[in-house]
Amino acid sequence: AIDAIEAAGKTVGSDIANGEIMVISFDTTHAGLQDVLDGKIECDVECNPLHGPRAEELIKKLEAGEDIDKLNYVDEEIFAHDDTVKSVKATNSLDEEKDFDVTPLTQDILDKRAY
């Protein structure tokens, strides 16, 4: 999306009042998070690719006739270019509201990530 926006002669960023287009993503790979640091993505919500092995384990338990918890949560984070937004409120699958912290991204955080 960023390439298409820039190819159209537009600018990505958080200054909406001056015509910038704010990009929010769910690509928390190193490349996606680098765009957060560079100010091209304002907020990046993690969709953890490391959950695959955990899901496979749960499927094997079900196939073996074992009981598993109805809800299984994935450890994920929300990263932002700055500290403007402290948290995001969302409703979970049980119709409960929950606050999710937003972490201002730093190079140190990016360097320590597995993907």
Stretches with model-predicted labels:
Residues 22, 42-43, 77:
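Conserved beta-strand segments of alpha/beta enzyme cores
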Residues 47, 51-115:
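Hinge/cleft segment of the Venus flytrap/periplasmic-binding protein
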Residues 1-34, 56:
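Hydrophobic alpha-helical
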Residues 38-49:
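Short beta-strand elements at the ligand-binding edges of bilobed clamshell
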Residues 10-14, 46, 68:
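Secondary-structure boundary/capping residues
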Residues 2-5, 9, 40, 63-67, ...:
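Sec/Tat-exported extracytoplasmic proteins
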